[in-house]
Amino acid sequence: MNRKKANRIIVTAISCFMILFFITGCESKVKGPTDTLVSGTIYISVDESFKPVMEEQIRVFEKSFPLAHIIAAYKTEADCFKDLYNDSANRMVIVTRGLNDQEDVYFLDTLKYYPHWDNIANDAVTVIVNSKSNDTLFTLERLRDQLSGNTNREQKIVFDGLNATSTVRFVMDSILKGEKFDTSVVQAVKNSQQVIDYVAKTENAVGFVGISWVGNPEDSAQVKMLNNVKIVYVSCSLCEDKPFVKPMQASILTRRYPLVRGLYYVLKENYNGLGTGFVNFLNQERGQLIFRRAYLGTRMDFGVRRVKINQKL
């Protein structure tokens, strides 16, 4: 064998080795997950209605597991589902519903597995008024008439948007029974904080927010906000004596408060990654205690707090 031929064989062998090394390296990068139950970085989208309580959940989880990083984007429920569908980096959404049959089929076709989803807590859509208002007793019939523009047209109703939000969808489904509200009596703002700010500045206004924005007496910022707004009582239409009920854990868990909705996770993960670890945390005692402290109804059975209400009607 001459030197020229030997050199050609060596070059060919080196080239083959480099190609094999490159292919093997690429395959390992594609196949190997970069996160575990308690480490790594994932991106999630959260319904803005639950921002206060989910910020606390993430803070405590990351403090407990310093190698875990959950990057949350807070947006409308519709935009959360857009992320779930279209953003390959999105691992999970926190919203007010699970997947329907058509969505299950879609994700099975695209992901080749079903996403996991389940209820993790229950929320109350809370009606608030200005602190100077004496109008603190509402029936569902009255809310329906006002949203339809049939009564009290001078009282402005404010939402965190006119469409695409879970609160608007809930009100249309549960109070208006699928009908649309009268947009001339409804004011739209960008988010739940702006709903609270609007009601705090407008004496003749009614707002709708999730209970985690105003229900936590251990949150100094929320206690301060409640100097400017009041949580109203809504009649329990299914109760025999038709009492007016304030949203709190007991009335949420028993459904005596009529405006209760679920809080769900939907997870795109088919291995024991960080999304699964965070869901486990939300479902277990520490996560459920955080929901409880925010005055959501929990899945885990805790003793219900007895609360003395001193606020005048």
Could you say what each language-model-derived stretch is?
Residues 26-66, 73, 85, 118-123, ...:
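Exported/periplasmic ABC-transporter solute-binding proteins
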Residues 6, 107-109, 187:
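Short, solvent-exposed secondary-structure boundary motifs
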Residues 1-24:
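Sec-dependent bacterial lipoprotein signal peptides
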Residues 78-111:
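Pocket-flanking alpha-helical
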Residues 113-115:
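Periplasmic N-terminal soluble interaction domains immediately after the signal peptide in Gram-negative
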Residues 71-77:
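A short glycine-rich beta-strand->turn/loop micro-motif centered on a GG-aromatic cluster
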Residues 45, 71, 91-94:
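Short, conserved beta-strand segments within well-ordered enzyme catalytic domains
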